[in-house]
């Protein structure tokens, strides 16, 4: 194995023995350390432990596979260098043992253990693991059966439970509560015991005992937090009052307020409940502010406007402090505790019944799984525990495993739950001197509490174990901190440190961010003066959605909040509702969220386009070993959740021309293709379902339109569509109602139902069919198919039925022809796969499958669209922060930082906590009234604190994904006001970290980010210098704040340096001419669009027709008609005869490519002297034949077209590592150069940039000739080379009246910063062998193209182009065209 230079802490983690907890920060190389530790013990001469005697537990199967691969690679490298026969034999043996080594997830380990000892727990050895969908359905069925039994028994306790937790309509809320409670209990080591102890939380006889309990301590903490927030606000009010011109007469009252709240905080800390109540009554009694006008300045120096502002802001801060105490009153003091005690005991009885029913359900569910011979995922862990422990002591199996495993290594230890922790303890040795548990993780990245992960397990060891000090030795239990980051640039690391030193505290984030936790730069990024590498500040983009008009992209007006970076305090802005949690079904809130997301998406898209199209900076490509420009695939957009905004972002990115892919867990069932197939399945199962039936009739499966559907419905206004379909199929045909007809029974059933009105119905049917025969055709085609499918559904499997429907209807092929066809087909295949998996369970049948899907959706669950994007595709990816964990990306955008944290889970009447148990309200069953309980408040408060700590860690995970650049985006209502608030919060904090109470009061990520950035010494918000900014850790970190008051591209943005540039560069003169023509053009005098123009004839013909129409209208108007009627008729006539005034814009292309322009110019050159008749038949069209991708059966052939070979050569040249080879190329022998180039081609194939066929089409000699040629010398010697430079220009073509967007990609731009000039280089693979004058041919073919390239470089890069160079690979020769020469070719087509 290679011997990297390990840091002292890493070496200690590799060498030391005992029970070790390695706190490995983001990017610290934890996986490499774990692999090296394992490898060292396998290969050490003294130890030489076989690899299968280690248990390596990973979080995912992918991580296990990667670990196994890394160990295998290390063994292979060791084998290559081994000299001794014994060593070779040992390594070969380890290579063979590797495939049976226990490198696995904990679930897989438990599975193997159960399969080995199944007989001890009386489990069938052929058991299978039910997937989550099957388990959900089985749980639901079991619980419904259990409820039926309880209802039959009519027990009062159960009835009280139903009355307390059900509704007046059903008992679904109670069922949901029991399922949640059962799931939560199964994450405990002893679920039964945990459930039995739940009523104890409600058994209290003394207030003092309650207040000293864990629940009481949480209540105290909640009061302290709110009081602390109130004190911060009062401090702000006080500071405003004492400013020059401020309301100094407020100061005595504010001092008294602070004193009373301070006393309340003290009592909440250590007083009795009576003390707290008394202190609260005093604190909440805010006296009125004095009305005096005492001032601290002479009248001559007072600015009345400023004085009024200070008075209002001071009063507002005090009013907000009052609200904090109002929140305490509405929660802790809403019902006096003395009144709660007797109710709490009654609630304890209710909780006891709930626990008993849940335990009963657990037993019945276990029986149901045994009957089906399946287990769920929680069973795997609990069965393993059953095998490993008895009466809480290790079994023989556990002792055997402890003796067998040399060491147990656990990755991602911060994400395990108590059950998993117990399993690991039982299979590892714990006694001093023999401990062999090695744990790796980072509690700052523990973000899976919703999966029952308990970061407290990590934190307890982290706090109790001694920490390794450099030079120190081993200890029985030891923490080793790895904080050197080998992933990110120093600018990224310093920014992360600067932020989290201030906002991650033990009270708010459950761990303090200190010197041990802070990241230290370890990655090496070469800074080449000739390259624009990615070092730069972390950008923070903020906007007020209420201040931007989305339709215009401009700020709404002077009445809106001022958001300028230079003067955020000046504008008051409109009063907008804020800090309101969106409620379910709140359409206005949802629309507002969508509009905010759309604004943010446009801002993000503009920033990405600027970065990519303008080649703003280069990133380091590890595989290439060189720097290259940013590509879309290098960019990821992280969000807390994609559910509600992914589609909005995708839509805006597509408009901006940015390829994008969002992998979500929603939206699948809402797609048209899936909805149509599910509707078809529903009517196959039950044709009486009208809504699905109508959906199928309107779909391409039948093809009826709305009118036809209406005519069908008119047959039986009170019936259903199935009956109308049968009647239409029958249509009075006597043969079809005879007994021998294949659909006799179906037709006779419907005819018999409507026997009395049958004659009238027959008349109706015949009338419809006479007037609309196409209805009969469609019904005759569909009805027999429907009957055949219904018959098939009863005798074939669900999966077979579904695939038969795809083939029989051709629907799978049909959706492939629609836009996004590949995605639609993938979605339908996912549905088929879901049907296959469903039938692998004990459930069968179409009805049950549809019922399963309905329940799945009714629980708010969904599936994401099928993934059709590969890892190597050049697209911007949207992923959630949770999905990004463990990954890294060159450029990271973090969006949605202004979105409020989701607190919906805290609104449930049943709250669950592993230590505090169940929190329910005080329920008056008789009167059906609920009151908040102190236990519920305590559980809710603790859950909120833990949720906030997790949100803080989620932010840390998001920020640490970035390797080279970070861009943060968020919205803030009343942005100017918020910035002032952030400043006040920052001023009131004398310490490095903000107070816990303030941090726990956050509603959005910006509530943490804003105050921290305000303190930065660079004065990011232009508010004036901050007193203690330079004393903050990592205060030298680089940040840039951009405050947007308009959407990028529509107007300027205000920021510390410069505004964003335009991406598309329009021809200003052309736009001006267009505006002038619009002002002077008269509607009605333009030619109608869509007609072939015959010179001298069209206009007169149209005028004649218009005149005749007008005369006909006048002739039909009675002479007695009044003037208003005639005017109305003239207005109707005018509107109906209106013609679009700019027909030329309809018939021309709005966007074209350089290649298309080149093709058209060549056609005009070839046809300049052709006859009109010949030219009219072959002239180029804006709607030329599309160029489709080659079919797979052609692509897979070895032969490539010349164009495909040219593309392959261009790709190989584009990715040549010029900077890496520049200094050594001339010194290398020819065979070494050829070997390097061959490896370069092979690398492109491995990275899927080239296919194997394309790689074979690239000649090593071609690449070597280029690098050794005059053109190659230009590339080596250029100060900066930019390859594959995309551009978009707005140009006025001589052949068109309207401007057109022209897009293209330049092969290479060679920049000389010293001379301030550029050269354009284009690589051509045309076969020019035998051409007498290749220079003339290339000039004629590509003069226009190079002229456009030169124009693009000069406009985009603001650098004059000296000359254009064509390198012909077939001739190994360059041809130089001066700027003046290509200009002539350009001006023949473009108005410059």
From Swiss-Prot:
GO terms for cellular component: cytosol; DNA helicase complex. The gene is addA. Residues 584-594 have a biased composition (Acidic residues). Its EC number is 3.1.-.-, 5.6.2.4. The lineage of its organism: Bacteria, Bacillati, Bacillota, Clostridia, Eubacteriales. CDD domains: DEXQc_UvrD (cd17932). The heterodimer acts as both an ATP-dependent DNA helicase and an ATP-dependent, dual-direction single-stranded exonuclease. Recognizes the chi site generating a DNA molecule suitable for the initiation of homologous recombination. The AddA nuclease domain is required for chi fragment generation; this subunit has the helicase and 3' -> 5' nuclease activities. InterPro entries: AddA (IPR014152), DNA_helicase_UvrD-like_C (IPR014017), DNA_helicase_UvrD/REP (IPR000212), P-loop_NTPase (IPR027417), PDDEXK-like_dom_sf (IPR011604), PDDEXK_AddAB-type (IPR038726), Restrct_endonuc-II-like (IPR011335), UvrD-like_ATP-bd (IPR014016). Residues 3-489 form the UvrD-like helicase ATP-binding domain. Residues 556-886 form the UvrD-like helicase C-terminal domain. Heterodimer of AddA and AddB/RexB. Belongs to the helicase family. AddA subfamily. Signal peptide: none annotated. This is ATP-dependent helicase/nuclease subunit A. It comes from the Bacteria. It catalyses: Couples ATP hydrolysis with the unwinding of duplex DNA by translocating in the 3'-5' direction; ATP + H2O = ADP + phosphate + H(+). The keyword Transmembrane helix does not apply. GO terms for biological process: double-strand break repair via homologous recombination. It comes from Desulfitobacterium hafniense (strain Y51). The keyword Zinc-finger does not apply. Residues 291-319, 556-594, 1051-1126 are annotated as: Disordered. ATP binds at residues 24-31. Keywords: ATP-binding, DNA damage, DNA repair, DNA-binding, Exonuclease, Helicase, Hydrolase, Isomerase, Nuclease, Nucleotide-binding. Its cofactor is Mg(2+). Gene3D superfamilies: 1.10.274.50, 3.90.320.10, P-loop containing nucleotide triphosphate hydrolases (3.40.50.300).
């Amino acid at each position: 194995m290679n011997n990297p230079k390990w840091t002292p802490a890493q070496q200690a983690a590799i060498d030391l023995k005992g029970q070790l907890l390695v706190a490995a920060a983001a990017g610290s190389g934890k996986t490499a350390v774990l692999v090296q530790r394992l490898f060292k013990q396998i290969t050490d001469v003294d130890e030489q432990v076989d690899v299968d005697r280690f248990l390596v537990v990973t979080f995912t199967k992918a991580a296990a596979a990667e670990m196994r691969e890394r160990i295998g690679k290390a063994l292979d490298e060791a084998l290559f260098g081994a000299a001794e026969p014994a060593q070779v034999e040992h390594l070969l043996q380890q290579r063979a043992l590797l495939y049976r080594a226990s490198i696995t997830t904990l679930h897989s380990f438990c599975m193997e253990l159960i399969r080995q000892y199944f007989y001890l727990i009386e489990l069938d050895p052929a058991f299978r693991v039910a997937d989550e969908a099957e388990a959900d359905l089985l749980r639901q069925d079991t619980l419904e059966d259990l409820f039926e039994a309880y209802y039959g028994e009519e027990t009062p306790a159960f009835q009280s439970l139903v009355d307390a937790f059900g509704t007046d309509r059903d008992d679904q809320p109670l069922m949901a509560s029991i399922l949640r409670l059962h799931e939560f209990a199964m994450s405990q080591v002893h679920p039964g015991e945990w459930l039995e102890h739940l009523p104890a939380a409600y058994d209290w006889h003394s207030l003092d005992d309650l207040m000293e309990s864990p629940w009481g301590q949480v209540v105290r903490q909640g009061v302290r937090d709110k009081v602390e927030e109130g004190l911060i606000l009062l401090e702000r009010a006080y500071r405003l009052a004492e400013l020059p011109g401020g309301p100094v007469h407020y100061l005595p009252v504010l001092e008294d307020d602070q004193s009373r709240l301070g006393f309340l905080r003290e009592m909440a800390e250590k007083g009795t409940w009576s003390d707290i109540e008394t202190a609260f009554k005093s604190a909440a009694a805010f006296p009125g502010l004095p009305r005096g006008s005492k001032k601290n300045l002479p009248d001559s120096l007072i600015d009345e406007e400023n004085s009024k502002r200070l008075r209002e802001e001071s009063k507002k801060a005090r009013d907000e402090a009052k609200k904090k105490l109002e929140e305490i009153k509405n929660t802790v003091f809403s019902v006096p505790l003395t009144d709660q005690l007797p109710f709490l005991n009654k609630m304890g009885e209710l909780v006891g019944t709930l626990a008993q029913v849940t335990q009963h359900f657990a037993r019945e569910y276990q029986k149901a799984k045994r009957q089906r011979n399946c287990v769920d995922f929680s069973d795997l862990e609990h069965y393993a525990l059953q095998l490993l422990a008895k009466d809480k002591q290790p079994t023989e199996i556990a002792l055997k495993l402890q003796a067998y495993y040399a060491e147990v290594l656990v990755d991602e230890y911060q994400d395990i739950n108590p059950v998993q922790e117990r399993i690991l303890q039982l299979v590892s040795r714990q006694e001093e001197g023999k401990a062999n548990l090695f744990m790796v993780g980072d509690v700052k990245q523990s973000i899976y509490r919703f999966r029952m992960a308990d970061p407290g397990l990590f934190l307890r060891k982290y706090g109790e174990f001694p920490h390794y000090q450099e030079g120190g030795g081993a200890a029985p239990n030891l923490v080793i901190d790895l904080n050197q980051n080998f992933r990110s640039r120093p600018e990224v690391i310093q920014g992360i440190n600067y932020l989290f030193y201030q906002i991650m505290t033990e009270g708010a984030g459950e761990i303090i961010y200190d010197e041990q936790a802070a990241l230290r730069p370890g990655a090496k990024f070469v800074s080449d003066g000739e390259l624009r590498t990615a070092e730069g500040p972390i950008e923070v983009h903020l906007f007020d959605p209420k201040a931007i008009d989305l339709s215009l992209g401009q700020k709404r007006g002077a009445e809106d909040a001022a958001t300028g970076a230079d003067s955020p305090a000046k504008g008051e802005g409109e009063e907008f509702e804020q800090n309101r949690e969106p409620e379910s079904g709140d359409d206005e809130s949802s629309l507002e969220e969508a509009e905010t997301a759309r604004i943010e998406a446009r801002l993000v898209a503009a920033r990405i386009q600027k970065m990519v199209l303008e080649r703003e900076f280069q990133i380091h490509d590890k595989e290439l070993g060189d720097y290259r420009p940013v590509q879309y695939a290098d960019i990821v957009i992280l969000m807390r959740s994609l559910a509600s905004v992914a589609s909005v972002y995708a839509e805006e990115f597509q408009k901006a021309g940015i390829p994008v892919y969002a992998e979500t867990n929603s939206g699948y069932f809402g797609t048209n293709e899936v909805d149509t197939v599910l509707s078809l399945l529903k009517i196959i199962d039950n044709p009486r379902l009208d809504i699905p039936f109508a959906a199928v009739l309107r779909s391409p499966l039948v093809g009826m339109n709305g009118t036809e559907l209406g005519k069908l419905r008119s047959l039986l206004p009170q019936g259903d569509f199935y009956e109308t379909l049968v009647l239409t199929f029958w249509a009075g045909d006597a043969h079809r109602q005879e007994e021998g007809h294949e659909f006799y029974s179906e037709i006779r059933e419907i005819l018999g139902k409507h026997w009395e009105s049958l004659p009238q119905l027959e008349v109706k049917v015949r009338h419809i069919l006479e007037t609309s025969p196409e209805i009969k055709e469609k019904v005759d085609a569909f009805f027999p198919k429907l009957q055949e499918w219904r018959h098939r559904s009863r005798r074939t499997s669900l999966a077979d039925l579904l695939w038969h429907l795809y083939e029989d209807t051709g629907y799978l092929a049909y959706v492939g022809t629609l836009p996004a066809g590949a995605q639609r087909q993938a979605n339908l295949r996912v549905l088929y796969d879901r049907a296959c998996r469903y039938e692998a369970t004990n459930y069968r049948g179409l009805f049950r499958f549809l019922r399963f899907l309905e329940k799945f959706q009714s629980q708010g669950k969904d599936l994401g669209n099928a993934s059709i994007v590969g890892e190597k595709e050049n697209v911007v990816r949207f992923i959630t922060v949770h999905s990004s964990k463990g990954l890294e990306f060159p450029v990271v955008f973090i969006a949605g930082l202004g979105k409020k944290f989701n607190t919906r889970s805290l609104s449930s009447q049943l709250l669950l906590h592993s230590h505090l148990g169940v929190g329910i309200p005080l329920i008056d069953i008789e009167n059906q009234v609920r009151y908040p309980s102190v236990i519920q408040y305590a559980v809710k408060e603790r859950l909120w604190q833990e949720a906030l700590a997790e949100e803080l860690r989620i932010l840390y995970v998001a920020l640490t994904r970035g390797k080279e650049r970070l861009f943060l985006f968020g919205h803030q209502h009343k942005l100017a006001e918020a910035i002032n608030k952030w400043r006040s919060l920052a001023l009131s904090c004398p310490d490095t970290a903000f107070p816990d109470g303030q941090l726990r009061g956050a509603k959005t990520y910006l509530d943490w980010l804003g105050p921290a950035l305000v303190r930065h010494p660079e004065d990011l918000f232009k508010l004036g210098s901050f007193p203690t900014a330079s004393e903050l850790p990592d205060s030298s970190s680089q940040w840039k704040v951009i405050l947007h008051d308009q959407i990028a591209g529509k107007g300027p943005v205000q920021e510390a340096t410069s505004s964003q540039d335009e991406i598309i560069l329009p021809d200003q003169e052309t736009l001006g001419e267009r505006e002038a023509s619009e002002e002077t053009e008269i509607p009605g005098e333009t030619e109608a669009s869509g007609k072939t123009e015959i010179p001298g004839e069209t206009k007169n013909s149209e005028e004649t027709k218009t005149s005749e129409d007008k005369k006909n209208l006048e002739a039909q108007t009675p002479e007695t008609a009044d003037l208003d009627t005639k005017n109305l008729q003239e207005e109707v006539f005018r509107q109906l005869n209106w013609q679009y005034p700019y027909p030329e814009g309809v018939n021309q292309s709005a966007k074209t490519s350089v290649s298309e322009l080149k093709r058209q110019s060549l056609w005009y050159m070839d046809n300049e002297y052709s006859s009109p008749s010949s030219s009219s038949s072959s002239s180029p069209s804006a709607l030329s034949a599309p160029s489709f991708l080659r079919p797979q059966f052609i692509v897979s052939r070895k032969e490539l077209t010349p164009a495909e070979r040219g593309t392959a050569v261009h790709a190989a040249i584009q990715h040549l590592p010029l900077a890496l080879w520049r200094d050594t190329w001339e010194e290398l022998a020819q065979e070494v150069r050829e070997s390097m180039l061959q490896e370069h081609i092979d690398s492109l194939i491995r990275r899927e940039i080239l296919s194997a066929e394309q790689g074979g089409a690239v000649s090593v000699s071609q690449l070597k000739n280029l690098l050794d040629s005059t053109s190659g010398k230009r590339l080596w010697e250029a100060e900066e080379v930019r390859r594959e430079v995309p551009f978009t220009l707005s140009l006025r073509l001589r052949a068109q009246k309207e401007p057109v967007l022209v897009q293209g990609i330049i092969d290479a731009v060679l920049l000389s910063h010293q001379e301030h000039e550029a050269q354009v280089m284009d690589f051509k693979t045309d076969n020019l062998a035998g051409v007498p004058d290749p220079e003339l041919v290339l000039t004629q073919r590509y003069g226009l193209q190079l002229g456009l390239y030169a124009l693009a470089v000069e406009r985009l890069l603001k650098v004059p182009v000296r000359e254009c160079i064509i390198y012909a690979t077939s001739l190994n020769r360059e041809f130089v065209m001066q700027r003046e020469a290509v200009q002539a070719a350009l001006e023949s087509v473009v108005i410059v």
